[in-house]
Regions:
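N-terminal membrane-targeting hydrophobic helices
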Residues: 1-201
Length: 201
């Protein structure tokens, strides 16, 4: 599968639409949620989150939960401890009133999460063994000879699209306006604790 955190790249073009038509939080978190079944199971197995039914009863409620956790618990401390090159670009989002925004735009947020999750499933359908397009497009079931090894086309698409998606996200972040007044302090203890929790999990 493509790397989970490359998935938001596919929804970024939607940010060129009028601002009131979409929720960036909803699109980005929605594009990530289908892979959270892997994290919850602690193994690469998904019975629900990559299905049409799962969009509504797994991805949508989980996406809403993650959005509230991120904006109310994670966001400010994370942004405060980012390296300056990132902090200076994300500082504008620190004062965002998510709870108020959601009350006024709950339908837009909901639809954005569903669109984000659907985009994830669409992308994976080209790169999973049992993906819809892998099963219906014979060329995706072929292999390519590389240095004497047979590499499946879907693996090439997996890694190639992951790299391309990552580059798109890096470029999008680079193009964000910067705040030159951000201090350069980084709390190493914060990152040590975060790394410890990640390794523990």
């Amino acid at each position: 599968m493509p790397f989970t955190f490359s998935h938001p790249a596919i929804v970024l073009p939607l940010t060129f639409l009028p601002r009131q038509w979409f929720s960036l939080t909803g699109l980005v978190i929605g594009s990530l949620t289908p892979d959270f079944e892997y994290f919850l199971r602690m193994r690469i197995k998904s019975n629900y989150s990559h299905t049409i039914d799962g969009l509504f009863w797994f991805d949508l409620p989980l996406g809403l939960l993650l959005a509230f956790i991120f904006h109310n618990i994670v966001r400010d401390s994370l942004f405060d401890n980012l390296p300056t090159i990132l902090k200076s670009r994300f500082s504008a989002f620190r004062q965002f009133d998510w709870n108020g925004h959601f009350k006024r735009n709950w339908l837009v947020v909901t639809i954005s999460i569903l669109i984000g999750a659907a985009s994830h499933i669409f992308w994976d359908s080209f790169t999973h063994d049992h993906g819809y397009f892998v099963q219906t497009i014979p060329a995706l079931q072929n292999s390519v000879d590389f240095l004497g090894r047979q590499i499946p086309m879907l693996k090439i698409l997996q890694h190639g699209s992951t790299l391309l998606g990552g580059l798109v996200i890096v470029f999008a972040i680079y193009k964000l306006p910067t705040n030159k007044n951000e201090n350069e302090n980084v709390n190493l203890q914060y990152w040590a604790i975060l790394a410890g929790l990640t390794l523990t999990i």
